[in-house]
Amino acid sequence: MDRETNVDSIRVLEEQIKEHERAIIKLKRARNSLLNVSTFPPEVLGNIFRWNVVLKDDFGGLEEGSHNFLLVCHHWFEVASRTPELWTFWGTSLEDWEKRYLRSSAGAPLDLVLDEVPYMFGFISESQQMVLKDHTTRDTLRRVHLRSDMHCLLTAIISPLISPYGGLQTNSLESFILSNQDHTPLDVSFFAQSRLSKLRHLELSGCTISSWDHLASQTTLLTTLKLFFPDISPVPTMPRLLSILASNPHLQNLELNANAIPDRDRDGSYQIPLRHLKELWLDGGAGQVFGLLRRLEYPQKMDKLSLGLSHCAVADISQTIGPYLRDYLRCRGRPRNGLGLVLSSGRYITFNVGDAGRPDPSNSAFSRMSLFMWVTVGMDRALSDDALDKLTLDLIAHTPREEIVYFRTCGSLEAVKDLDAQMPNLKALDLFRVPLSAVFPTLSQDGSRVHKRFPPSLQHLLIRRPNLTTNGWNPLITFLSHRSSSGNQLDSLLISGPCHMCSRVTQRVMDVVQKFEIDDECLESWCPFGNCLR
């Protein structure tokens, strides 16, 4: 064999070796991906699959480089099919759930988890009723999670689960979530006849309950209790509510709205120890909220304490809110992540603070406060701007201002006039329908006049519904530019709501802020960019 032939043969062999190496690399990547996927619990894999396929309307099929995604889906399907005792979420409709029931083992525990039940009619088929009755008879239901805006549909699904004696036909139920988003409240009196010895998670929203007695005698293992009742539901007495809490000493998450908190407390001589509590959320009048707080013995360092106060008046601020916050900070020390303060005027009752009155900022930077308080003033009366400003200033004056790291205001301008003095450690400012021309007035060339209003600690700015034209952004951009040039650039800016922001303005903002986000409503209306900003 001559020299040239040898060289050609060597080149061919080298090419084959390279091809095999590439194939081996692909095989190793596939193996490693599968090994990594196998380490995830099936619940996580199910959520990956659900968010990537089920919840995306624009899912157009797999693209190149989707091998890992296929492995995740395949592994999730194998786990779901072969080990129903580990993964028991079978779909988002009763049809999916019924099909899965027919293929699973008769004794395998199943979960009835139907989020936003997608039905146009308030009834279910006879075969679906049979499936539900069969599982309640076999006592194989571990979780029942139902959310719908149709009262009649929720009633139709729950009816097969109730025994002839009026209670739930299951002793194995560990979690029960019933969210009725219809205007007609859902009666859950069947709890009075139910045996709930294994129940750990109870969440009722948009429901009424005729008797509170049974919850204290039958629930002893609850770790999560969330009750959001409408106005027509009977409010428990303080002894009855405390009895329920005392029967469940391992509570970690407690959330109650005004119609689940007693109005009066005639005997405040003893406290209920809740030493495992991590998150406490209370919403109601100042007397209700602080009356219950005085009766709870909770850990010194909880993950989050959220207080919602409605119909707030000057007397409530000076006599109740301020003293409580000062005592809280004196006895428990500085909150882990500071104090978040939200102020909403009743003029914007259709836009309550967050969902159902809860602070729910869009940016994660606004949601890590360990002590969160939001106050709704003037809900039942029209307040003038001067009256609203007075309430706002009184609230700030009676609050330990050095602890406030998050502040949200809905309309009051006095609150943001001199933030560097009022809230020297403020990190996040949230403005809703506040005229930006008043917050960021016409500036001198270097922007120093408005710069003094905001403390150097400010890192995050959220502006909701600014309703501005292009030229209206100039004061804000000047402020941001001055902060950036002085070495104190904002970490994030979030614009939420319809606004006229052209590409030129968008680019100028992106140049002077580390992270810039615009919500979908604003993007669809005006912005030429898209998800590249996210």
Tell what function each PLM region has:
Residues 1-534:
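Leucine-rich repeat
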